[in-house]
Amino acid sequence: METVITATIIGASILLAFAALGTAIGFAILGGKFLESSARQPELASSLQTKMFIVAGLLDAIAMIAVGISLLFIFANPFIGLLN
């Protein structure tokens, strides 16, 4: 039973690490492309900024979903029920 709990915690940690890494890379690419496109066409900057904030919210949602799944695995572990 301790092996299942340990493996679940390690899996949840890896899930959170990759979600944070993916979100950070996504924000970096998003910010870079926004600055590049705003410098290329300054008249579209306000329109692009609105779209950038929408995509930034979706990027944050990916990390929050990963946190929710990790909390589910840690506190309401469905794999422990399979042992009994």
Swiss-Prot record:
GO molecular function: lipid binding; proton-transporting ATP synthase activity, rotational mechanism
Residues marked Reversibly protonated during proton transport (site): D60
UniProt-annotated location(s): Cell inner membrane
First-listed, main subcellular location of the protein, grouped into a coarse class: membrane
Record's keyword annotation contains Transmembrane helix: yes
Residue spans crossing the bilayer: 9-29, 54-74
Keywords attached to this entry: ATP synthesis, Cell inner membrane, Cell membrane, CF(0), Hydrogen ion transport, Ion transport, Lipid-binding, Membrane, Transmembrane, Transmembrane helix, Transport
Membrane-protein topology: Multi-pass membrane protein
GO terms for cellular component: plasma membrane; proton-transporting ATP synthase complex; proton-transporting two-sector ATPase complex, proton-transporting domain
GO biological process: proton motive force-driven ATP synthesis
Record-linked CDD domains: ATP-synt_Fo_c_ATPE
InterPro entries membership: ATP_synth_csu_bac/chlpt, ATP_synth_F0_csu, ATP_synth_F0_csu_DDCD_BS, ATP_synth_F0_csu_sf, ATPase_proteolipid_c-like_dom, F/V-ATP_Csub_sf
Subunit structure: F-type ATPases have 2 components, F(1) - the catalytic core - and F(0) - the membrane proton channel. F(1) has five subunits: alpha(3), beta(3), gamma(1), delta(1), epsilon(1). F(0) has three main subunits: a(1), b(2) and c(10-14). The alpha and beta chains form an alternating ring which encloses part of the gamma chain. F(1) is attached to F(0) by a central stalk formed by the gamma and epsilon chains, while a peripheral stalk is formed by the delta and b chains.
Name this protein carries in UniProt: ATP synthase subunit c
Gene: atpE
